[in-house]
């Protein structure tokens, strides 16, 4: 008789100790498959679409489907020995236990938007656990204003679509998360999560009320069974350091029947510098119903190089109220009624995803996962706590033109963000004025091309230093940047992790380390920038 997954997990400690050392490559697949079969009760022949060795016809398409940075999609990019395309929670449990028994590194990938490929690349022998099939979304509008259980493999577009579908007859609801619809919910939320309602509602994790995670022992834990410390840690500290996130329960938020969006662009000869300078004083302090993203991009106009400044906005209200507000607070913007479009909230989701015809297309477009789609890119991030002078902005614009293709994206905080304690979640940056994303994209492959663009990105990062936070220079976990430090997981693991950990988490790093030490003392869940365990104290002789 086939035993249940639970029974097999209970007896997992009986797995042969001979598997503690990785077997030869020729038997890795067979060893893992047998372990996986034992854990799940499924015969090996039924697992050919779940456990994928490199020889499988499904291996490359599955691996490539959610590699979102083409830098890591080349013939020389490190490849996992196995991809596990989990179809059930039981598959995730078995993956953790069997990977641990074989002494391999496990990378967990939901949407594949990790900017530096940490969720699917390693220089050590590794397996990839692909969560894209675990994307069930269950919305309950009767639960205290609306809630939803969201599988880690669901995309934000799928989340928004399901909320829209379910709330049609219950008033309009939404969820404060990112504007890119193909981002995976698991990584986005566990890293903090933000979007264009951040000033109204705060971070995505501020609306997480429960979660399910597979721990290092293969157990499925919810908020009650994992305890508040671990629940706190996975709400902004990155879930991959502590286990495998299966799903989050989120609380929905009300949005008005009509919202307003606009885009205004100016170049330097059109007094863009005045607009950019004033933006710093308005965007973080205006009505929390208004989110104004600022983007700076070098462009060519009439054969002359310049910088284009774009303000892209969402206002949770009517156009007339928006015009009254910005005519008074931000005349330098020069906003006109014809710049604005009123629409429903779900239409604004599509508009922010670069669908200019959002008022006529159907929301089903949000269900397009757009697999096997990637460009070459590098991202970095900064936080600003004091407005940059006009001279400083002029300097940065000149350096942008020198860099050629590098763009900056300024995201204002304030509003709800400034009302929440910096220790409420691992995300410590709530009191800043705004966040800056450094964004470099290019089209052509090649090592020399990549080196050139990476060097330009890093050079500009050094030019930005005088204008951003210091000691440490803070950065955002979900804008992963391996330039700020890598953990080799040797004897200096804690010290190496502290370098990047303080930049991502500030003083919250200390609590994250304590949680990590308690729940994963052997550091099974590790990557290039994971949370370390506390250093072992030398024994006294």
UniProtKB/Swiss-Prot annotation:
SUPFAM superfamilies: FAD-binding/transporter-associated domain-like. Residues 1-20 form the signal peptide. Binds 1 FAD per subunit in a bicovalent manner. Its EC number is 1.1.1.-. There is a cross-link at residues 113-180 (6-(S-cysteinyl)-8alpha-(pros-histidyl)-FAD (His-Cys)). Accumulates in cell walls of etiolated hypocotyls. It is found in: Secreted, Cell wall. This is Berberine bridge enzyme-like 1. It comes from Arabidopsis thaliana (Mouse-ear cress). The lineage of its organism: Eukaryota, Viridiplantae, Streptophyta, Embryophyta, Tracheophyta.
